[in-house]
Regions:
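Bacterial Sec-dependent N-terminal signal peptides
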Residues: 1-25
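Short, compositionally stereotyped local motifs that mark structural "simplifiers"
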Residues: 20, 765-873
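Accessory carbohydrate-recognition regions in carbohydrate-active enzymes
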Residues: 24-387, 391-435, 441-490, 498-524, ...
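Short proline/glycine-enriched turn/loop motifs at strand-loop junctions of beta-rich domains
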Residues: 159-161, 716, 795-800
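ATP-dependent phospho-/nucleotidyl transfer catalytic cores
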Residues: 495
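Short strand-turn-strand beta-turns centered on an Asx-Gly dipeptide
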Residues: 699, 723-726, 807-808
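Beta-strand-rich recognition domains
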Residues: 705-710
Length: 875
């Protein structure tokens, strides 16, 4: 009887918990996505309809030019030119916006300034796979949805005998060639070949309309050509006109291969004109993808505050106004999170047709056998977080990415750097398809030819372009040989480290030895006299150094950000800096320095905290370097600051360019509480999870659950951790910790728990095999002189000997031993090496030229006196 009573008592609680769990499973994550986030500021995203990783991005075009018009849309614009079928998400260079459709009424206009329309933000709506707006000029409601390869328009016209759809093939990018053809009174097809960032991009399209058009006209150079069914040229437009149609649906398939391919895509993916069905399919697909990570909670709901006396606020005062509405910060956080996850899935983009055909980097048609071929890889950005995230939740697609890389290599002769459509743009530095491949292989992904991929990686870094020849010869890229020399040295060293990891797995000992040594070349641009990476030229350091200078020796940044770009050898960086305390002090200085940049002005440098630049990717790992110091709580402090201040649920809610998923992937990973600072190695650094609970639904059927207590009090300092019910005492998680499934419980408090943090095992990112001898450097007041000058030599490395020549010959261990500064009176080339334990550095060379008295002296190599005992102090 007692047992029965207990059962009855617990039944309501059981059903309550069951209903709560069921509700969580049924939660519509698409409602937590706001596609307008990132369309303002410098986010450069678009709000239109797209499928996850789809070929079509059907979105409104409101801006024709300018840096903040890269995606074709900007949040504050009030004019719309139409709806085109391809868009880039968050890039810093404009392209795409192909095949524009624009519904109008009245006499058809072909000039874009005549057919454009005002629209109002209050009439816009967007959700994953859907967009709508009202065109004020025509009172037409335009709705958009999409499948992978088809864009679907639904236009609701007012009553009119002149309901038009303009098709503009000249829109946006310079056109190399185009044509359009009327197939019948319900179908048209066409082609557009354009040149912009992608120098030679082809888009074919095939469009079908739900109703027959009563008439049409084709135009070349804005001149109507009566009676023509097909026109070809560089400025081709047309319109179709309906008589009081009410609603017209246009479905448009696209292809890089042919109009026939576009038709195949269209018929396969959208066989009818059921707009609602396609919209639901898009929503369901997005729901499935977004459900791969389920988050709950995150912050308390703050109730309204009582009305306060307004005294003291004044006009334009900066005091906060009384809160009159309930603020659900958890919902805001979840909106930021799921919009970020959504952005992570807008690129890369599938590029093959339904039959597998695609246009390759050689501009020839190929067929993807057994995989889908993708394009739009912003690899300098996305190797850092986007690809590690997708490797966790989408291994199948990651395998397709790698097979796409290898196909690109076969067709274009190089692993991709920044591939766009059927073009390699060669944008940015390094070759960061390499870490994507290596990270996947190191974490167990198979299904591709690893030996062939390894050869491709070696070929990519042994070319005689992009400064790689200078890098191999000198152990660094010299400024006189290549722009962005410091950044390229650091990027190449990291890529070499990745190749070394692959060689180690494949048991290629000779390759491992070579590339693990090359991975240490970052040391050759680190100046121990200043504590920063610096430009090397003519045997020494470039003079007039300012760490805040943005110049041509760095890629979209300066020495502050790039001095920490050694994720493969953080422990080596600590050693060369003189210890953990110096690293911590340097990090403190980074975050507390003035945010003012000197030198060039670059729009990419945004979202600053001191000289930390979250709006650009080289800074994205820096906060985690505190984990290697004695005060890892500072990682948690700055992560919380970044997530709470540089990500917002507003159009300007991104700190910089979205960069095809990287800016958002950083948030997703860090919101979960971990981040891989060096893809290619197995561990994720521990940060601070921001949700009460986050469940990663893995492809192997397992779940990794992150449970965080303390978020309800807006705290962000680690107090304790458990993994699968047992105390966890490391500042990192292994990949297997996550993919094997389990529970990671994190306890958070308001104050740093330094005693607890001191007991945690610190991460290691160190290169210990095959240490190199660091290049020495020359110190001279100038590289030209009129009277005898004295040139000193030095090394940042302890216990080395320097050997040099003055006759142009290559120095060796039998050359003259350097002991005192060298005085020269004639034009001389000094070549010098450092030696330690029978190993030598690369040869460092500097030429110093004697000139006549009346010739102005050249730029100095380095001014001032070398002080080998100088201690760097960071404040």
């Amino acid at each position: 009887m007692k047992y029965l009573k207990r059962t009855v008592l617990f039944l309501p609680l059981f059903f309550l918990l069951l209903n709560k769990a069921s509700a969580q499973r049924k939660l519509d994550y698409t409602k937590l996505v706001d596609p307008f986030i990132g369309t303002g500021g410098h986010g450069h995203t678009y709000p239109g309809a797209a499928m996850p990783f789809g070929m079509v991005q059907l979105s409104p075009d409101t801006r024709l030019e300018g840096w903040d018009g890269c995606s074709g849309y900007y949040a504050t614009d009030s004019l719309v030119y139409g709806f085109s079928h391809t868009h880039l998400s968050g890039t810093g260079i404009a392209d795409y916006c192909d095949v524009l459709f624009m519904p109008t009424t009245g006499k058809p206009q072909l000039n874009q300034n005549d057919y454009r329309s005002h629209f109002q933000k209050k009439n816009e709506a967007a959700s994953p796979g859907y967009y709508s707006t009202l065109l004020d000029k025509y009172q037409i409601t335009a709705e958009l949805t999409a499948t992978l390869r088809v864009g679907m328009h639904r236009y609701s016209f007012p009553k009119t005998s002149e309901a038009n759809i303009i098709i503009d093939l000249q829109h946006r990018d310079p056109v190399l060639d185009s044509w359009v053809e009327v197939v019948n009174d319900r179908e048209i097809r066409g082609f557009r070949r354009s040149s912009s960032w992608a120098k030679d991009q082809s888009v074919y399209f095939y469009a079908k309309f739900s109703k027959a058009f009563k008439t049409y006209s084709l135009a070349s150079d804005n001149q109507i050509k009566d009676g023509e069914k097909k026109l070809q040229g560089k400025n081709i437009k047309m319109f179709v006109q309906f008589d009081n149609p009410g609603e017209v649906i246009a479905k448009v398939g696209i292809s890089s291969v042919s109009a026939e391919g576009a038709l195949k895509n269209l018929d396969a993916e959208v066989p009818d004109f059921d707009f609602k069905k396609v919209m639901k399919q898009a929503k369901d697909t997005w729901q499935k993808e977004l459900s791969k990570i389920q988050v709950e909670g995150g912050a308390p709901v703050l109730p309204p505050l009582p009305q306060q006396n307004n005294m003291g606020y004044g006009f334009g005062g900066n005091r906060p106004q009384p809160r009159t509405k309930t603020v659900d910060y958890a919902h805001i956080k979840q909106t930021i999170f799921y919009t970020a996850l959504y952005h992570c899935m807008l690129a890369p983009n599938i590029y093959n047709d339904v039959d597998g055909q695609y246009r390759g980097l050689d501009q020839q048609v190929h067929k993807a056998e057994g995989f889908n071929y993708y394009t739009v890889f912003s690899l300098w950005d996305t190797y850092r977080a986007e690809h590690p995230l997708l490797l966790l939740i989408d291994k199948k697609r990651t395998l397709d990415f790698i097979k796409s890389f290898m196909a690109m290599n076969e067709q274009g002769g190089l692993l991709p750097i920044w591939p766009l459509a059927s073009n390699e743009t060669y944008c940015m530095t390094g070759n960061h398809s390499i870490p994507v491949i290596v990270d996947a292989y190191a974490k167990g992904l198979r299904g591709f030819d690893a030996e062939k991929a390894f050869k491709m990686m070696k070929d990519a870094v042994n070319r005689n372009q992009f400064g790689l020849d200078s890098y191999r010869k000198n152990g660094l890229v010299l400024a006189e040989d290549e722009k962005e020399s410091v950044s390229k040295t650091l990027e190449y060293a990291y890529d070499d480290w990745c190749i070394a990891q692959m060689a180690k797995i494949l048991k290629k000992d000779q390759d491992y030895a070579e590339y693990i040594q090359r991975a240490q070349n970052w040391k050759n641009v680190y100046n121990n006299q200043t504590g920063f990476v610096q430009t090397r030229t003519n045997g020494g350091w470039l003079s007039s150094f300012k760490p805040s200078d943005v110049d041509d020796n760095f890629t979209e940044g300066n020495a502050w950000q790039f001095s920490f770009s050694v994720p493969q050898d953080v422990n080596g960086l600590i050693k060369i800096m003189g210890g953990k305390e110096n690293l911590e002090n340097k990090l403190d200085a980074l975050f507390s320095a003035s945010s003012a940049m000197t030198g060039k002005s670059l729009p990419d440098i945004t979202g600053t905290i001191g000289q930390y630049v979250h709006g650009n990717e080289p800074s994205h790992h820096i906060t985690y370097l505190y984990n290697f110091t004695d005060d890892p709580y500072k990682t948690q402090y700055y992560l919380s600051m970044i997530m709470n201040t540089l990500y917002k649920a507003t159009p300007d809610g991104l700190a910089g360019n979205e960069d095809c998923g990287q800016m958002s992937a950083w948030y997703v990973m860090n919101a979960l509480g971990f981040y891989n600072i060096s893809p290619g190695q197995n561990n994720f650094q521990i940060g601070i999870p921001i949700f009460d609970k986050a469940t990663i639904n893995l492809e192997n059927g397992k779940k990794f659950v992150v449970a965080s207590s303390g978020n309800a009090t807006n705290s962000y300092y680690l107090q304790g951790m458990q993994l699968n019910g047992k105390p966890y005492d490391k500042l990192f998680l292994s990949y297997e910790n996550i993919t094997d499934g389990g529970y990671w419980d994190v306890f958070i408090g308001k104050l740093p728990n330094k005693l607890y943090m001191a007991d945690l095992e610190k991460p290691v990112a160190a290169i210990t095999d095959y240490p190199i001898v660091v290049n020495p450097y020359l110190v001279s007041p100038s590289k030209t002189f009129t009277k005898p000058i004295t040139i000193a030599a030095a090394s940042a490395q302890d216990s080395v000997k320097l050997y040099y020549t003055l006759d142009g010959s290559t120095p060796n261990l039998q050359s003259k031993l350097y002991s005192n500064p060298i005085t020269i009176s004639n034009t001389t080339t000094i070549k010098i090496i450092a030696a330690k334990n029978s190993m030598t550095s690369k040869v460092v060379s500097g030429t110093f030229s004697k000139i006549k008295e009346d010739v102005k002296a050249g730029v100095a190599v380095q001014t001032g006196q070398h002080n080998p005992s100088k201690k760097i102090q960071y404040k």
